[in-house]
């Protein structure tokens, strides 16, 4: 799906800043970029418009030969993370250009994609907010169980997407309409209003909306 331009970064953590009226605003600090353009794709040649960007320089011993050859064409060094961003229109950037936090302005709204914090194997009460079984009156060892998961003759199966216990978290999550409160270009920092997915130091993608 076509998107608008974005930049990779790391979630530093949360803090608060004070607005002009004295109110406290909770913000997430993201250290983003600079992200050099490694490859540019266009609809005529590749079937779609996109740019591939790199983030966080890597040592040569940590990059395999195919990736090394691919990144050498851009002449910007080797990177730990490569991400492709599909675009609606042909990219204005060229191979070797840097994408920085200057891409964004305070007040605009962005969407942030990250990997949610992994919680491991979780039961239905924690994972899906089930109410559980009664605490007493004849109920024994079923207090946190899900209850019935299906019927007998019909449908004779468990329905697809039935909410059950399982691995919780560690999934790609996108939060939309986050307002940029401040951009600190000298430190490559973006301050967005509210929380973003993932743990501290987690990889995130910040995109225009």
From Swiss-Prot:
Transmembrane segments: none
One term of GO molecular function: rRNA binding
Pfam families the record matches: Ribosomal_L3
Keywords (A to Z) from UniProt: Ribonucleoprotein, Ribosomal protein, RNA-binding, rRNA-binding
GO biological processes: translation
Stored InterPro entries: Ribosomal_uL3, Ribosomal_uL3_bac/org-type, Transl_B-barrel_sf
Described purpose of this protein according to its UniProt entry: One of the primary rRNA binding proteins, it binds directly near the 3'-end of the 23S rRNA, where it nucleates assembly of the 50S subunit.
PANTHER family assigned: 50S RIBOSOMAL PROTEIN L3 (PTHR11229), LARGE RIBOSOMAL SUBUNIT PROTEIN UL3C (PTHR11229:SF16)
Assembly, per entry: Part of the 50S ribosomal subunit. Forms a cluster with proteins L14 and L19.
Family: Belongs to the universal ribosomal protein uL3 family.
Name this protein carries in UniProt: Large ribosomal subunit protein uL3
Source organism: Oleidesulfovibrio alaskensis (strain ATCC BAA-1058 / DSM 17464 / G20) (Desulfovibrio alaskensis)
Name of the coding gene: rplC
